[in-house]
Amino acid sequence: MQKRVRNRLITIIICFCSAALGISIVLYNLEKNIVFFLPPSKINEIEQGKELRVGGLVKIDSINKIAADKISFVITDNIRDLEILYQGVLPALFREGQGIIAIGQLSDGKFIARQLLAKHDENYRPPS
């Protein structure tokens, strides 16, 4: 009986360790794909040059077209403002007062975005 209990215990431990390892691998790989972001009030100068995702509302009267495909605007979380520079095609839902997530790097107090994601509420209807 002793040998049977020991074998069962070893089998349970191996199954538990295998499941824990599998879950760890899945969570590690998902970390890069989960879109989380920091509000402007949580950004500090220490994170210069690091790839970040920042999110907030586009401030009213802050959109400034520099060139045909280059734009600057300010996002806010009602605590702190952050200027964003972006070159590329704007998302269809981009407008003042709209929530956005910008992916890029902080440089000299300005955020240089390489990608913009427009957020929408649960009542989204595609533009017609």
Swiss-Prot record:
GO cellular component, one term: plasma membrane
Predominant subcellular localization, coarse grouping: membrane
An example molecular function term from Gene Ontology annotations: metal ion binding
Amino acids binding heme: H120, Y124
Disulfide bonds: none
Pfam family of the protein (one): CcmE
Function, as annotated: Heme chaperone required for the biogenesis of c-type cytochromes. Transiently binds heme delivered by CcmC and transfers the heme to apo-cytochromes in a process facilitated by CcmF and CcmH.
PANTHER family: CYTOCHROME C-TYPE BIOGENESIS PROTEIN CCME HOMOLOG, MITOCHONDRIAL (PTHR34128:SF2)
Name of the protein in question: Cytochrome c-type biogenesis protein CcmE
Organism name: Rickettsia felis (strain ATCC VR-1525 / URRWXCal2)
Lineage: Bacteria, Pseudomonadati, Pseudomonadota, Alphaproteobacteria, Rickettsiales
